[in-house]
Amino acid sequence: NEVTNSEYIRIFASSFQIFLRNDYPIFLLMTGLYENIYNLQNDKVLTFLYRAPKLILEPLNYTAIRKQYMDIFSLDIDAAGELASLTKGYPFAFQVLGYLYWENRDKKTLEQILPEYDQYLDEYVYSKIWSELSDLDKKIVTEMSLSGETQVKALRERLDMKSELFSVYRERLKRKGVIISKEYGKVTLALPRFDEFVKIQQLM
């Protein structure tokens, strides 16, 4: 679980490859962030991982999340939909927002819960992600957060970046799970309220 390209994982994976060659009846299931799996399989002695079946997990289904919130909190479809939208299908956000709403449902409005929700995302996830971004990664994400721009061409022009360079960093940010590109020529932030987190970083 949560594998990274560490020395111990490399040793273990190398040993596992030997066990496979000896036809031992063993199986290995690895889970982790896309970027960490990507870096691990690119290790020159672990190329066998390229041939291993991979399942890339998509965000949780919006309709399923909305239904859960409707059932648990006895909400109408619009109120549950508003909650579901705030998670963007991110599992940790789904859990945290559900917990906070349950704890405060009779005391606070959803708007009043958001600061604590943002704090959880910041402390447990976003600060770590932000610390691992390069300066140019941050520059791109900051421009997306402040301007709300999603058109790749417009973003490149705002950032004064050539297409080739922007493409490299777009792929980096996709591997890190920070942005998604579901439509040709467009990119959006993948994480819920990450734009709010980024805006706060500019004030620090």
Regions found by a protein language model. Give the residues of each.
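Conserved Walker B catalytic segment
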Residues: 1-35, 42-45
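Alpha-helical DNA-recognition elements
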Residues: 14-15, 100, 172-176
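Conserved small helical "lid"/interfacial subdomain of P-loop NTPases
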Residues: 52-80
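A short helix-loop-helix "switch/interaction" segment in the helical subdomain of ASCE P-loop NTPases
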Residues: 78-92
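Winged-helix-like regulatory helical subdomains adjacent to P-loop NTPase cores
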Residues: 93-165
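Short amphipathic alpha-helical interaction segments
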Residues: 159-176, 181-184
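Minor-groove-contacting beta-hairpin "wing" of winged helix-turn-helix DNA-binding domains
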Residues: 185-192
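Short, amphipathic alpha-helical interaction segments positioned at domain boundaries
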Residues: 192-204
